Amino acid sequence: MLAHEIRARVARGEVSPLEVAQAYLKRVQELDPGLGAFLSLNERLLEEAEAVDPGLPLAGLVVAVKDNIATRGLRTTAGSRLLENFVPPYEATAVARLKALGALVLGKTNLDEFGMGSSTEHSAFFPTKNPFDPDRVPGGSSGGSAAALAADLAPLALGSDTGGSVRQPAAFCGVYGLKPTYGRVSRFGLIAYASSLDQIGPMARSVRDLALLMDAAAGPDPLDATSLDLPPRFQEALEGPLPPLRLGVVREALAGNSPGVERALEEALKVFRELGLSVREVSWPSLPQALAAYYILAPAEASSNLARYDGTLYGRRAAGEEVEGMMEATRALFGLEVKRRVLVGTFVLSSGYYEAYYGRAQAFRRRLKAEAQALFREVDLLLLPTTPHPAFPFGARRDPLAMYREDLYTVGANLTGLPALSFPAGFEGHLPVGLQLLAPWGEDERLLRAALAFEEATARAHLKAPLGEAL
């Protein structure tokens, strides 16, 4: 059952918030041991569900929250041994807003350590399996949230997207994932990876459910100086006819894709034309180089952000002789991928190489953004694959560069700050395939309106992996 359907039943008195919470908790306890979507569950869930006011706008809805988003009183690990026992004394703004409207945190979902990865294989605890094929990855780094949705272990989820970490797992697991305009959702309470790229984003099994989450979570926040003063009107934007829109298909993303992705793209273009959109091919010339710039800028910011985890003020304090030994032992707890990115970031920020790498990457970022702004003077939306292929088997991307290439089509939205939405667009065999839409800065609602039209025209909502009995 979809989140907005659950909410309607609660509002009519057909089911109580407690009954909804009990049903999802039972399903998680039965199915998640074989899936690994959750790192921890909210032990007070049923008590909170019994106390919630059923008249609140989100009463009856439980939310799976990625474990790099702070939850007061609930362990928040960022998928790392360094934060294995960290229980925040504060709440992320996005979570606080959902709870204020009656939603409940079901549990914390698995992720690649500190959000660094594209498969959830880099969690310090265990990998998450793809509900459509347990031998394949769910994507990352929000793989636990995507898998929980696909298996119907939760009706709603929060993830975070630094280079595609909401959209890529959404594509691999056949669900919807939105990377909002940078600043549209407060980052307060999000454990930082790369601060100029990070963005909390909603994940769901229908566009209407995304809108429900965004109306609750978005908006300005005095605790986040980068948050935008744009009032959320997502559910309102879904009403009425689809306006005539100009859709640009990004030429640089048309080659090198798997047969299923190519087929999904062709079918989607046919649907959008039938919906009245004018379609044309456009060029975003710098997009193929965006990945190289991203893997300079993101590690650079990570090396700065993660420097705080030395065991003195932040992070688990490992045993070691004197302060220096303690700091070395603490940082040895970082996983291999985190160490790799911190080393790269430290190198590109070093005095001898700063301009050659970091300075040039920042200049490229400005050019990429200028090209996108020029494109949106010609079209209203951009369409391209979320990933070049469906989910890959565990262990298939042991080469770090091969794993980094998973972000080929997604990093552009993060580098430019633009909103991007991945939506289910078909299958390759038994594996879901996703496409993504990009809109101009601040036009997140436009993405959802176009995706809803596609969803209604193709019945792409309600996708769910065949696990257990349906709720």
From Swiss-Prot:
Which family does the record claim for this protein? Answer: Belongs to the amidase family. GatA subfamily.
**NCBIfam families noted in UniProt:** gatA (TIGR00132)
Originating gene: gatA
Role this protein plays: Allows the formation of correctly charged Gln-tRNA(Gln) through the transamidation of misacylated Glu-tRNA(Gln) in organisms which lack glutaminyl-tRNA synthetase. The reaction takes place in the presence of glutamine and ATP through an activated gamma-phospho-Glu-tRNA(Gln). Also acts on Asp-tRNA(Asn).
GO molecular function terms here? ATP binding; glutaminyl-tRNA synthase (glutamine-hydrolyzing) activity
Its name, as the record gives it, is Glutamyl-tRNA(Gln) amidotransferase subunit A
One Gene Ontology biological process: translation
Q: Name one Pfam family in it.
A: Amidase
Species this protein is from = Thermus thermophilus (strain ATCC 27634 / DSM 579 / HB8)
Gene Ontology cellular-component annotations:
glutamyl-tRNA(Gln) amidotransferase complex
Enzyme's top EC category: ligase
Q: Name the active site residues.
A: 66 (charge relay system), 141 (charge relay system), 165 (acyl-ester intermediate)
Q: What is its EC number?
A: 6.3.5.7
Q: Which UniProt keywords apply?
A: ATP-binding, Ligase, Nucleotide-binding, Protein biosynthesis
**HAMAP family given for it?**
GatA
Instruction: Report the catalytic activity.
Output: L-glutamyl-tRNA(Gln) + L-glutamine + ATP + H2O = L-glutaminyl-tRNA(Gln) + L-glutamate + ADP + phosphate + H(+)
InterPro entries for this protein: Amidase (IPR000120), Amidase_CS (IPR020556), Amidase_dom (IPR023631), AS_sf (IPR036928), GatA (IPR004412)
